[in-house]
Amino acid sequence: PVYGSAAKWCEIRDCVFDDAWFKGGGGTAYTGWDRCWDCLMENVETFKMRHAPLFQWAASGCVIRKSVFHESDGQWHSGWTNENLIEQCVIESALGNGGYGYGMWASPPEDAAHGPNGPRNVVYNCDVSSPKAGLWMGGMNENWLILHNRFTADSGPGVFAKATSFDHIIKDNVFVLKDGKSPMVSLNGADCIGIELTGNALYGGNGKIVSGKAQPSLAENNQTLPLGPTTRPAPSVPSIYEWQLRNLKP
C-alpha cells in the first residue's frame, strides 16, 4: 500500500504510483489515509491499485484532491472514517485489480472485518466512472455531501443507500446511467430518510430520480434526460479546500 498510517499533518504530493506487486489480501495496493488526521494528498496519479483513493480506520479531516486514479475504486474502507474531503479528482474504477467495481464504496455495519463509516464525508467536483453503481453506501452513513460531481455507471444506480443511511445532501450532480433500468438514487431501506436531492441531472437509466423503500425529504429541480454526451458540473467555487484557505482565519 501507499498510504499514511497513524499520522497527522502529513502530505503526499506530486507523485505517480504505477501498479503494485501484490494485490492478494487486505491492506494491499491501497492509496490513501489510514488512522490519519488532517492530512493532505494532492496531485497524485495511480495506476492499477485495488482501492484508491481510500480512507480507513477513523481517518478524519483528511483531504484527497486534484488527483487521478486509474483502474481502482474510491473507498471509505473501514472503521468510522468521518469528515474527509475528496475533491477535483478523477476516479476510473475497473474490475481486475481487486477493486469492487463501484465508483465509490463505503463498508456496511454488518461487515465484522471493517464496520461502518461515520458522518459528514464529502465528495465535491469529481468525475467518477465505474462498471457498477457510482456510489454505494453500506449503512450508518450520516449527512454526507455529494456535490457538483459527474458519475458515469455502466450498470446500477448513481447512488445506492443500503440501510440507515440518512440526512445526505445530493446536489447539482450529473448522473450518466447506461443500463436503461436503474434510478438516479436507490434508497434500499425504509430508514434512509432526510435525504435532499436538488438540481441533479439524470441521463439514461430508467428515468426515475429515486426508487426504493424511502422517499427523500426534498426533491426539486432535478432533470431526467436521454442518454447522451454530458459535461462535468462547473461549480462557481471549484475547491472547498482552497476556499477555506482563503477565507477561514487561523
What are these regions (language model features)?
Residues 1-250:
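Extracellular parallel beta-helix/beta-solenoid repeat domains
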